Amino acid sequence: MSKGEINHVNSWDVNIEDTTPAMQQYLKIKKEHPGILLWYRMGDFFETFFEDAVIMAKELELTLTGRDSGAKLGRVPLAGIPVKAADAYLQKLVQKNYKVVICDQLEDPKFVKAGQVVKRGVTRVLTPGTLTESNLLKQNSNNYICAIYKDNKKDLFGFSYTDISTGEFKTTQAPLNLIMAELARLNPSEIVAPSLKQDIKPFQIVADEVVNLPEEITKKYNCSKIPPSVFEENFASNNLKTVFKTTSLESFGYSKYKLGFQAAGALLAYIWETSKDNMPKFDRIESYELSEYMILDASTRKNLELVETLREKNKYGSLLWAIDKTKTNMGARLLKNWICQPLKNVDDIMARQNSVSELVKKSDVRLNLSELLDKIYDIQRLATRMSNASASPKDFISLKLSLSILPEVLDATKNLDYDMFAKIRDYADEISDYVQMIENTIVDNPPILLKEGGIIKPQVSGELDYFRDLLTGGEEWLKSFEEKEKDRTGIKNLKIGYNKVFGYFIEVTNSNLNMIPDDYIRKQTLVNAERFITEELKKHEDDVLSAKFKSTELEYKLFTDFREYSKEYVSKIREIADAIATADVLTSLSTVAVENNYCCPVIDESNDFLVKNGRHAVLENILPLGEYVANDLEIKSNVTTGDDTQFMILTGPNMAGKSTYMRQNALIAILAQIGSWVPADSAKIGVVDKVFTRVGASDDLTLGQSTFMVEMIETSFILNSATEKSFILLDEIGRGTSTYDGVAIAWSVAEFIATKIKARCIFATHYHELNVMTKKYPQIKNYRITISENNGEIEFLRKVVSGGASRSYGIQVAKMAGLPNEVINRSQELMTKMQKDFSKNLASGKKMVHNEDGVPQLSLFGM
C-alpha cells in the first residue's frame, strides 16, 4: 500500500495495539457501541473513522479522506463535520434511521499536557425514537418509540409507547391484529423488542441475532433489538418503580396489563441507556384498553386519508387539513391524535362535544381564546428539555412569553361550563412568580451559544457584575493609561494597541525610541516602530483575560443552576401544556363548525346511522363554493323489518361519486366520535366500534400479491373482525377475476355481512346482478348515483337515490377519458350486440356461448 493510499479496514478487524493513542481511545468506545455511528469530537469537528466514515461520506455526501493511524495501519478512512453544523447532519442521518453516538471532549484541550490524550466520553446516543431536540423533530407530529414483548404461551403482546419529547407514556396488551392497528395509528420512528438468536448457519461461528417480532412488523418498521433479560418481569417492574418513585405499580393497572408493563420497563431502560446522564422526566404512565376506542386498521386509515393523502402523502387534502385551525404545535399534535383514535364511550364523546358546542355559541370567547393561543410556544416539548438539562436560554424566554399569556387565558375561560383549566387555577400564582423569576434572571435576547456569555441580567450576581465592570471599564482604563504614558514619556504619538498574538502593547515610532523609560520591555520590532509592555499594562491584560474567562464560566454556572432549579416546575408546565392543547383543539373544532356550517350530531348507543344532506369534509373545502352535492344516508344495523336499510347496494357509473359518498359517511362517523360537529344538516350516529374500508388496492409486489389477492386478504380480515356495531364500506368486491367468480364472491360477501354480521354496510358495485338480492333479504336495499343522459352524453348529478342502476355507462366514461373514436365506436357496436344476445339467452335459458365474431356471451347470475 502506498504512503498516501487509504486502508479501507473495518474497526472490528483492527488490533488496538497497532494504533495511535487517540485511535486506541476511539476504538475502545466504538467497541462498546457496535452498529452505531460514532461521532468523535476532535476540536471543532466531529470525526468518524473506518466503516463509519465510509457510511457518513455516502449518506451525507462528504469527502472521504484519511488519517494516519500508526505505522501498521497507515491512513484509515476519515469523514468529519463541523460541530456548529452537527444538527443539520444529525437530522439527515436520523431520517435515514441511523443511530449516532456523541462522544464529546470532557476537558478543555488547552489544559491537557503535551503527549496526553484529551479525556472523552459518550454524552448522548441519538436514535430515531429518542430525540428531544426541537430542530430534529417535526413540530406538528409526535415522535413515538414503542416496545413490544410477546407472551410465549399465547397470542398476546405487551405494548408500550412514549414520545419522550412531550412526556406521553402509555401501555397496554392485545393480540397481534390490534397491535398492528396501533402501530398504524402511531407510526413509530422506532420499535424496541427482545433479540432472538437464529440457528447457526454452515461456516458460521456465532449465531446472528434478529428482533423477536413477526415479519409484518419488522418489514415495515425500524426495529432495534435489546437483550431479552431487559423485558423480564422483575427487571422491568423495578425500572418503573425507580422512575415513578413507588413501591407498587398496582395503581397504574399493573395486574391487568403485566405484559404491557414489561414492555414499558424495557422501554425505559432503553431510553435510560441512550440518554446517559440526561434522562428526561416522566410524570406518569397510563394503561389503556384498545376496546375503549374506535378501531381503524392501516388500510382504512390510508383509504380515508385521515392525516395525509394516499398518493402524495401530503397533509393538504386530508381530513386533518380540513379541520386543523389549531394555533399551537401542541394542539396540532393532539388534534392528529384525536382523529387517529376516535372515542367509543358516549359520555366521553359528549364531554368534548358539549365544549365544542359552547364555544360555537360563545363566539367572543372562541375568538379571544384563538387569538391568545396564537402567542404560545411549544411549552410541552420545552418542558422535556428542561427536565433533561438541554433547555437553552432562548427556551426560557419562549417559556416566559408563553406563561405570561396564561392569566389572560384563565380569565377568558372562567365562565365556560367546562373549565379546561380548573386544576391549573390552583397554582396560577405560583406560575406567575416563576415567570417573574425568569424575567429577573435571563436577558430578553440571549445568545444562541451557551458559553458565549451575555445570558444573565445585571444584579443577579454581585461577583458577575464585578467581572463585567472590569471588562466594560477596560476601554476607559486604556485611554487613561495612554494619556498618562504620553505625559510621563513626552512621546505625543505613543499608542496603546492590542492583537490576539501579542496582547496589549505600547507602540513607539523609531524617531522617539531615545525617549522610552527603563521600565518598558520590548515585545515586537516593526519596520518603523517598536512595541513594548510594562508591568502595569501586563497586569491589566491578565485581569481582563481572567475576568472574561471567569465571567463566562460564572454565567454558565448561574444558568445551569437556574435550569436545575426549574426542573421542579416541569410537571406543572406539562399540565398547563396539556390543557392548552385541549383548549386549542376544541377551539379549532368549534371554528370549523362555524365556518363550514356543520351540525351538532346526536350520539347514542343505538344502531342508527342517519345523516341529512351530508357532505365530504375535505372536498367541500376544495371545490368551488356550493358545487359539492349533499346526500342523505339512512342505515341501521341488525335490522329485523323490511322498512329499514342495513345493507346498501350502491350502483352507478365510474366517476359518479360512489367512493366519495362512502368516504364522506365514514368521515362523518369519525368526526362525530372525536367530539366534533359534522358536515350535514342533521345527523344521528349510533356509536361505531370499527370502520372498515375496501375501496381500492395496489399490487403488493414485495409480497408477490396481486390486486385481487390483496383485495381478498383485506375482505377476509373485515369478515373475521367486524361486529354489528361496525361500519363497513366495500367498493368493487370481486373485480380482477372472471365475471362468474367475481359476481359469486360479491354475492356471498354481501350475504354474509347482511345475515351473519348484521353490520351497517355500503356496498358499491358494478355487478347489477346483485340488485335482485333485495327480493330475498329485506334488510338489503338498492341505491344508485343519478346521471343525466342526452344524445349519448352523460352528466354526473352526484345524487344518491333509491333503486338500482341498470347500466354502468362505461363506454361514455371511456369517451370522456379521451379514448380514440374508433375504439369507442367499436365498443358501442359490441355492447349493442351483447345486449341483444343476453336478452335471447335469458329468454331461452341458454348458457354462455361464443358468436361468429369470437365475442363471449355471458350468462347472468340467476335467482
Which residue stretches match the model-derived regions?
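Basic, polar low-complexity surface loops/patches
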Residues: 1-333, 338-361, 381-384, 388, ...
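Short hinge/gating elements
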Residues: 12, 67-79, 245-254, 305-309, ...
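Amphipathic alpha-helical transducer elements in NTP-driven molecular machines
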Residues: 20-23, 39, 50, 80-90, ...
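ATPase nucleotide-binding head domains, primarily ABC-like/P-loop NTPase cores
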Residues: 34, 50-53, 257, 327-328, ...
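A conserved P-loop NTPase coupling/switch region
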Residues: 45-46, 50-66, 158, 168-170, ...
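Active-site phosphate-binding and catalytic loops of NTP-dependent enzymes
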Residues: 103, 128-137, 278, 417-420, ...
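Amphipathic heptad-repeat alpha-helical coiled-coil/stalk segments that mediate oligomerization
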Residues: 233-238, 295, 310, 401-476, ...
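Hydrophobic alpha-helical segments characteristic of transmembrane helices
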Residues: 370-373, 397-400, 573-582, 586-590
